[in-house]
């Protein structure tokens, strides 16, 4: 594996970088700088083209993982990162949201360290935070919400918690019930199981449940309901990335900002900072 930008260089380094929830305007300045400097960018399927466009000198390698679609095996992603680093230069492993939140970071960090590859992590705005911001609903409130729960009902078949292994996959549900709600990642393909588990553990059927799809993007959509009436996303949003907020009442969501139209002045300031 050879890269013109990395020719003749010693073994490179890998940086796990958070791409944020979607909009390029929610990317951190450090993430943008690293993309501009990168020789290789190994990116998730949901990373937006506007974000990838910042990697002007890099070889782009897509390693998508999306429900219901062909996914790149984790072992293959690990090998790709090691191979790119050994070819030399800067490798950016670009992950949607924050690289340490439901992003398989542990496997990649372990593989890189085992191979003797220097690695670091740059945080990003996680989808739960961006979704609450879009609704102008605080994630914590004095006297009301003292805990933040980020959960997922997705359990790998090889994990001991999986029912097929004789375990229970309700740890995530108990955490949500104990906190009275939270943010649920990758919930769209597990609606029935999620609803049944939470109701069986005592979360009230009237608990507000809000889907936020395409968070921070022009096609952002909000579907407000309750846990008892929770249903899959409507057909128009089927297959779109979405997060479920439980216990978050948003009967009248705040106006959704048009992240693609934040203004040339803001973009110019950001690009000037990146260049320096």
Residue ranges: model-predicted function:
Residues 1-125, 130, 229-231, 237:
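Class I S-adenosyl-L-methionine
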Residues 2-4, 10-14, 86-91, 104, ...:
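A contiguous loop/helix-start segment that scaffolds small-molecule binding in enzyme catalytic cores
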Residues 3, 96-179, 221-225:
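Class I SAM-dependent methyltransferase SAM-binding "motif I" and its flanking Rossmann-like core
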Residues 17, 60, 81, 150-151, ...:
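Generic structural hydrophobic/aromatic packing signal, biased to beta-strands
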Residues 54, 134-135, 197:
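Residue-level signal for well-ordered alpha-helical positions
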Residues 59-65, 118-120, 139-146, 202-211:
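Short hydrophobic/aromatic-enriched beta-strand-loop microsegments
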Residues 69-75, 142-159, 235-242:
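Short, basic, helix/turn surface patches
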